[in-house]
Design a protein with these regions (language model features):
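Helix-to-loop junction immediately C-terminal to a conserved catalytic motif
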Residues: 48
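Conserved ABC ATPase "signature" region
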Residues: 63-64, 111-129, 181
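Conserved ABC ATPase signature
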Residues: 134-138, 142
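Catalytic Walker B motif of ABC-type/P-loop ATPase nucleotide-binding domains
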Residues: 159-162
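A short, surface-exposed alpha-helical micro-motif characterized by mixed small hydrophobic
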Residues: 201-203
Length: 240
């Protein structure tokens, strides 16, 4: 369980998060949706301890991570996998080296074991025989898949997907969503998807939180959000 309590964050005079309250259920896929610039990525950075709030708590399995030292946060972060907006691949590394990076950093596996795991993770995201390619040789959708393979390399308990379909065409975007659902079933963990891509995301998630004006203004199942009578939510959904 991840619980966010009265989370506030400002940058200078600009207040981004104005008292976010949210419970992210274990073993579920939760989407956090909202317009661009609403602070979705800022919220994610608090969940993994990359930002400290001005006030409020982020509690993961009973531990308030806002009180942890950097060493304590490092242990927490090892429980996470992240797929970033732009895939965040290392341009100077091959695909195989990119996926192997967390395995080399955080395990004592032998090179043969790492290569076998890299092949397995790439096959899980429907990529075959691409280990020696460079990121520059890949399409946008393939880069996302490599990023996903790297995110799940250590079999994380929690995976965060930050705008996983941004820059992709609708067909490729739907394929990425199907992979997210497959990874959730494989890992049997907790998934958090940050997106403004609605209603497509509603097909795979269990819960939806709507971030607007620095707060979560609604939380429920996709059906509950779709049928909400809140004018702001309906306006957001109509724009999509």
């Amino acid at each position: 369980m991840i619980e966010i309590i009265d989370l506030h964050k400002s940058f200078g005079n600009f207040e981004v998060l104005k008292g976010v309250n949210l419970k992210i259920e274990k073993g579920k896929i939760t989407a956090i949706i909202g317009k661009s610039g609403e602070g979705k990525t800022v919220l994610v950075k608090h969940i993994v301890g990359l930002l400290k709030p001005d006030r409020g708590k982020v509690i993961i399995d009973g531990v308030d991570i806002t009180k942890l030292s950097e060493r304590g946060l490092d242990k927490i972060r090892r429980r996470f996998g992240m797929l970033f907006q732009e895939s965040a691949l290392f341009d100077s590394m091959t695909v195989g080296e990119n996926v192997a990076f967390p395995l080399r950093e955080h395990t004592n596996l032998k090179e043969a074991e790492i290569k076998a795991l890299v092949k397995k993770k790439l096959e899980m995201v429907r990529l075959f025989g691409v280990e020696d390619k460079m990121p520059s040789e890949l399409s946008g959708g393939m880069k996302k898949r490599v990023g996903l393979a790297r995110a799940i390399a250590l079999e994380p308990e929690i995976v965060i997907y930050d705008e996983p379909t941004i820059g992709l065409d609708p067909i490729t975007g739907r394929a990425i969503y199907r992979l997210i659902l497959d990874m959730q079933r494989h890992l049997n963990g907790t998934s958090i998807v940050i997106t403004h891509d609605v209603p497509a995301i509603f097909d795979i998630v269990d819960r939806v939180g709507v971030l607007s004006g620095g707060r979560i203004i609604a939380y429920g199942t996709p059906e509950e959000i779709i049928h909400s009578e809140d004018k702001e939510i309906q306006e957001f959904l109509r724009q999509k």
